[in-house]
């Protein structure tokens, strides 16, 4: 029986074989590698991955799809909302210090998923995700550009990232109304040590009114914390490089 894509799950199934092959080449799975796929859907990417890996863990929220996937002998199925999955526990279950994570992420909750994985980054070797191209543009954006924002700072602090593949709407069934792309995310081996909640709060405050000078937003936040250091607040949030936000978070942690 044909599966009807569920709008509430943001389901758009990959159907272009050429694109699927290109994604698998970008991921470059090796036999025995511990890997988790988020949102396997109709297994378009799952099948070529598991053929190369031998075994694959998948996270699927849709109960009908999860039931189908369980019939595949080489898949371990976690039927759950990915935002509730403890990836450290998954790594432990796979006897792995680090796992690889891949997926065609639901576009309506892609940012929360990225932040959820950021909290588990210590057990992640790398990530390859299909996302809305506009989201990837924000992830990899440089300072002083309109795409540079909270997502850019939080993810660039912890990952080296690159856009590895453009994916047009007609590669999906049903086609989304936006262009897509695949991003590669490799955690930095020795990231700057800091309090992640402090960096998160600091960056959120800084970009809360991005057109205003930082003295109106971050300046007040620093005053409230009785910050005694020096930080130029006569700039807009988008003009401050990641390294300066990180250094400030370290001073405030």
From Swiss-Prot:
Alphabetical UniProt keywords: Cytoplasm, Methyltransferase, RNA-binding, rRNA processing, S-adenosyl-L-methionine, Transferase
UniProt key word RNA-binding: yes
Molecular function terms, GO-annotated: 16S rRNA (adenine(1518)-N(6)/adenine(1519)-N(6))-dimethyltransferase activity; RNA binding
HAMAP family: 16SrRNA_methyltr_A (MF_00607)
Intrachain disulfide bonds: none
Native source species: Acidovorax sp. (strain JS42)
UniProt KW Methyltransferase keyword: yes
Family per record: Belongs to the class I-like SAM-binding methyltransferase superfamily. rRNA adenine N(6)-methyltransferase family. RsmA subfamily.
Alphabetized InterPro entries for the sequence: KsgA/Erm, rRNA_Ade_diMease-like_C, rRNA_Ade_Mease_Trfase_CS, rRNA_Ade_methylase_Trfase_N, rRNA_adenine_dimethylase, SAM-dependent_MTases_sf
Main subcellular localisation: cytoplasm
One Pfam family it belongs to: RrnaAD
Protein name: Ribosomal RNA small subunit methyltransferase A
Catalytic activity, EC: 2.1.1.182
Substrates-to-products reaction catalysed: adenosine(1518)/adenosine(1519) in 16S rRNA + 4 S-adenosyl-L-methionine = N(6)-dimethyladenosine(1518)/N(6)-dimethyladenosine(1519) in 16S rRNA + 4 S-adenosyl-L-homocysteine + 4 H(+)
Record-listed S-adenosyl-L-methionine binding positions: 12, 14, 39, 60, 81, 104
Taxonomic superkingdom: Bacteria
Its job: Specifically dimethylates two adjacent adenosines (A1518 and A1519) in the loop of a conserved hairpin near the 3'-end of 16S rRNA in the 30S particle. May play a critical role in biogenesis of 30S subunits.
Subcellular location: Cytoplasm
Gene Ontology CC annotations of this record: cytosol
Alphabetized SUPFAM superfamilies for the sequence: S-adenosyl-L-methionine-dependent methyltransferases (SSF53335)
